[in-house]
C-alpha cells in the first residue's frame, strides 16, 4: 500500500557557474512515485524534515523511511522528527546501496534523463526543469515494476 515505506537519498550536481546543487529525492517504494525532489545549494537535517512535512501535507506520512547513514539522516533533528510522528527510520548498512534499490534506481534515471541532459544556469532553472521531469516521471511514464502503469 502507499505510504508504507518512503526511501530518500541525495543526488549532487553543479550549475554552469560551477556552484554545487544538492537534490533530496524521496520515492514511495510501493507506488514508485517520486514523492518529491528538493533542490537547494545546501540541505541541512532541519531542511530535510521541513521538506518531508511539505511532502506529507497532501498524502500523509509514511510508516517508515529508508535511507543511508548520511549526516543529515543520522542527526538528532531527523531522529526527533520521526519519533514525534511515530515513523520508523530504517538505516541501510554502510556500503550496501542494494538495500535501498528503489531510490538508487530512481536516482540513476534522474541523473541520466534530467541532470545529465541539462546545463542549469541557475538554481531557479534547475528547480523548474527538475519539477517538469518529476511530473513526467509520475504522470506519463509506465513502470515495469507496477505492471507498466504510471505511479
Residue ranges and their predicted role:
Residues 1-151:
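Charged DNA-binding/catalytic regions of mobile-element recombinases
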Amino acid at each position: 500500500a502507499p505510504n508504507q515505506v518512503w526511501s530518500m537519498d541525495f543526488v549532487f550536481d553543479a550549475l554552469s557557474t560551477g556552484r554545487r546543487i544538492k537534490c533530496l529525492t524521496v520515492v514511495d517504494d510501493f507506488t514508485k512515485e517520486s514523492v518529491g525532489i528538493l533542490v537547494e545549494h545546501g540541505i541541512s537535517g532541519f531542511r530535510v524534515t521541513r521538506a518531508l512535512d511539505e511532502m506529507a501535507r497532501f498524502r500523509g506520512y509514511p510508516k517508515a523511511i529508508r535511507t543511508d547513514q548520511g549526516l543529515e539522516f543520522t542527526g538528532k533533528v531527523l531522529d526527533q522528527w520521526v519519533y514525534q510522528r511515530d515513523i520508523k527510520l530504517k538505516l541501510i548498512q554502510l556500503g550496501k546501496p542494494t538495500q535501498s534499490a528503489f531510490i538508487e534506481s530512481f536516482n540513476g534515471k534522474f541523473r541520466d534523463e534530467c541532470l545529465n541532459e541539462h546545463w542549469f544556469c541557475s538554481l531557479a532553472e534547475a528547480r523548474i526543469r527538475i519539477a517538469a521531469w518529476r511530473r513526467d516521471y509520475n504522470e506519463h511514464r509506465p513502470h515495469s515494476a507496477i505492471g507498466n502503469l504510471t505511479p
